[in-house]
Amino acid sequence: MANSQLDRVKGLIDSLNQHTKSAAKSGAGALKNGLGQVKQAGQKLILYIPKDYQASTGSSLNDLVKAAEALGIEVHRSEKNGTALAKELFGTTEKLLGFSERGIALFAPQFDKLLNKNQKLSKSLGGSSEALGQRLNKTQTALSALQSFLGTAIAGMDLDSLLRRRRNGEDVSGSELAKAGVDLAAQLVDNIASATGTVDAFAEQLGKLAMPYLTLALSGLASKLNNLPDLSLAGPGFDAVSGILSVVSASFILSNKDADAGTKAAAGIEISTKILGNIGKAVSQYIIAQRVAAGLSTTAATGGLIGSVVALAISPLSFLNVADKFERAKQLEQYSERFKKFGYEGDSLLASFYRETGAIEAALTTINSVLSARSAGVGAAATGSLVGAPVAALVSAITGIISGILDASKQAIFERVATKLANKIDEWEKKHGKNYFENGYDARHSAFLEDTFELLSQYNKEYSVERVVAITQQRWDVNIGELAGITRKGSDTKSGKAYVDFFEEGKLLEKEPDRFDKKVFDPLEGKIDLSSINKTTLLKFVTPVFTAGEEIRERKQTGKYQYMTELFVKGKEKWVVTGVQSHNAIYDYTNLIQLAIDKKGEKRQVTIESHLGEKNDRIYLSSGSSIVYAGNGHDVAYYDKTDTGYLTFDGQSAQKAGEYIVTKELKADVKVLKEVVKTQDISVGKTCSEKLEYRDYELSPFELGNGIRAKDELHSVEEIIGSNRKDKFFGSRFTDIFHGAKGDDEIYGNDGHDILYGDDGNDVIHGGDGNDHLVGGNGNDRLIGGKGNNFLNGGDGDDELQVFEGQYNVLLGGAGNDILYGSDGTNLFDGGVGNDKIYGGLGKDIYRYSKEYGRHIIIEKGGDDDTLLLSDLSFKDVGFIRIGDDLLVNKRIGGTLYYHEDYNGNALTIKDWFKEGKEGQNNKIEKIVDKDGAYVLSQYLTELTAPGRGINYFNGLEEKLYYGEGYNALPQLRKDIEQIISSTGAFTGDHGKVSVGSGGPLVYNNSANNVANSLSYSLAQAA
């Protein structure tokens, strides 16, 4: 029996649903097709009653008329019979809704037939309705639902029409839009009232929020929403719609007395997981409360069914976007406080957009979710008690259509919010006479100066200059870009803005716009002019700065609601820098972007042309092409501060000193600053989108191709510091000063008196002709001196030093296990710390040994005037040993002196000392001098160890090896060493990296000077 009743009820409900859906579908179609008629007739719902109509059994014509009048529905009694009237209005007797000249027609016979199809359901509804709304019966409920739905549809269509006209350029006043927006909101409230079940039930909910229920028809928006929270925040027009939607949805969720009163969903307050849970709880509790009021079952099983259906109807995923909007608004508002003090409120404007659209999104999402949950809950309740009601069917039928109308209206509201922001921007620009977005970049820059002041103020001291000219670039700002896109002002913004600031004594100078901004730095024309500055100066690009030129933007439509603001760069081919004329200066171009790729993938580069002054300058170059006219003074070009690629420096064709061509090879592993075009996507609602193109930069490979070459021309540059990669240097016929910096470099001095530094890495350095100075630096280096007098210093590492020609040569091994080869001229050898091997030549050689050195092996192949200087050892601290044909010199360690070969104190091995050379070759060192000036001659050592004497070792002091009491060999030795050093021409003091602040050159890395001074000092002390 129960099953048959259940089947019957389900069948009746399905039938009612089908009729209602069909009616609603017909109504929606009629609305669309009859929009023009509606506007002419007014937004009215008219109940048409034919003269031959008699109400169905169980209903009365008077009830129908009273219900219509209570709801403000016009009643029209026709003189025509039902069939004629139906065909005139609807074309058929089966339709529920249609259009007449006076408004929307509701056919009474068909409506009555729908409501009274099942007597049992009608009676059941009557009891429930009476308990909740007294005389407001099923007829009034159904009429109210249809009336509010149709009103919302018409209001929404009217609103869309007004917006469309405005977009097409027609003069649509704000008051018209405001009225249409308010009408839409009013009809929305009526819809919710119908969906709740009865008007009284909805009034009861709102009454719990202290809003008195005034009239059954809910006529007058102020009466409907009086005393609701947060309404004071709503402005005119669409702002009112936004506020109304928020408070309506909030009141709907929070109406239940058992719900968490602190939960403020969809009213502009944070939506969290807890709130999402309470939404389901509130709706479930409300449905159960209705069942109690209706005297229906509230068993645990029924409650569980209701709760599960409601939970399925409300998806937390639908609220994620809402929560994101409110969180974004919160973050933006906090962020905006930093820049308001600098006169920019764009971030706050953007926050307001997210707040308002978030409120709209929250309201509509919540309303849709609650309507769906309400419909699902009513259906579950009906199933649980084997009863149903026409209102449940009506709710189920119309909620989907209502949701569609709300969603369509949302886009229009979003666009209105965006328009409001655009109007505020226009008002600001009119008042201040300045681009709003440029003002945003100005504020960003002011904050940047505030944040980096400590760093920037240190440049004066760090670079030893009186004035710092600091150039910075505010790159594309996503917040500024988003605001420009939302307000449809993408063509009014730029990719950023470049700034110039001045510091003296660590203090920021007040700028004089005409003098500083326009004259000193012009990024549109690509000009920098420092010629008026009469101080030692640093020009520094602190942040990456875009290529010079003008940006042009064009906004165009790419789809129905899609727009693109395209970027075109009218770029300059070069920067021109006019330097400080009468004072030393530093120019740091390492952050000045020279390489660019446009949106089509075409590559280009911008040259930097520098005209420097008459004093000592330092210039730090980047990865693109440069032309440097350094002028007088000692000028230095640096390539090691950024990745400039694999470099070749060539001065072989130079006609003047300081002329070089620098070729830059940017391979795949070279990462350089390059300018690129990117796109920011901005959405205004679901359908409208803006794309903005802008310039940005990346640090990534930039392989040159298509005939593009990176090449520098250096003029009057006295000194060059290479890159941190493997470089090649080819000197000129003039004096060259090269520094390899890091990397395994190849350096060829060629002609001229060259000064060549390998620095870090395993370098190969050829001095070429001329008096050259070669320093290996760190790493295992190979140094080769050519014709002329050479000074070679291996530095740290296992180095090889060679000289083949030259009258005077200095060979310093430095730390490490080195090999030194002398020439047939006069050589000064100093192997340094480590175990070294030294090959003397046929000329006059001087070998220097210190007690901290390791085991040195000397191969002396000729000459008859060689000297070994024990620079900090006396003869009492050494012993001489004959081992085969070799002479060993051991040094005392810890007071003990041993006379055998395998001994840590073994200092020197002079190979083949006792071996007769071919054709009288002399393998001996003719004189050995200790730190006190005492000396011993080679023949005396040979005689002591002659065959038959039985002596193969002895202490120098014991054998009285020194000649002549009071005779000192050091003065003459000092003269000899000084002659060798001065003859190399390497210590004139006029080279090295420039110290700008001192006003003159500073010898850099001049270990040769250090050694010479050390030798001279030790000899002077001994003398």
From Swiss-Prot:
Its main location: secreted. InterPro entries: Hemolysin-typ_Ca-bd_CS (IPR018511), Hemolysn_Ca-bd (IPR001343), RTX_C (IPR013550), RTX_pore_form (IPR018504), RTX_toxin/Mannuronan_C5-epim (IPR050557), RTX_toxin_determinant-A (IPR003995), Serralysin-like_metalloprot_C (IPR011049). The keyword Transmembrane applies. Keywords: Calcium, Cytolysis, Hemolysis, Host cell membrane, Host membrane, Lipoprotein, Membrane, Palmitate, Repeat, Secreted, Toxin, Transmembrane, Transmembrane helix, Virulence. It is a multi-pass membrane protein. Disulfide bonds: none annotated. It holds the Pfam family RTX. The keyword Transmembrane applies. Palmitoylated by ApxIC. The toxin only becomes active when modified. One of the virulence factors of A.pleuropneumoniae, which has a strong hemolytic activity and is cytotoxic for alveolar macrophages and neutrophils. Belongs to the RTX prokaryotic toxin (TC 1.C.11) family. ApxIA is partially deleted in serotypes 2, 4, 6, 7, 8, 12, and totally deleted in serotype 3. The sequence shown is that of serotype 1. This is RTX-I toxin determinant A from serotypes 1/9. It comes from Actinobacillus pleuropneumoniae. The gene is apxIA.
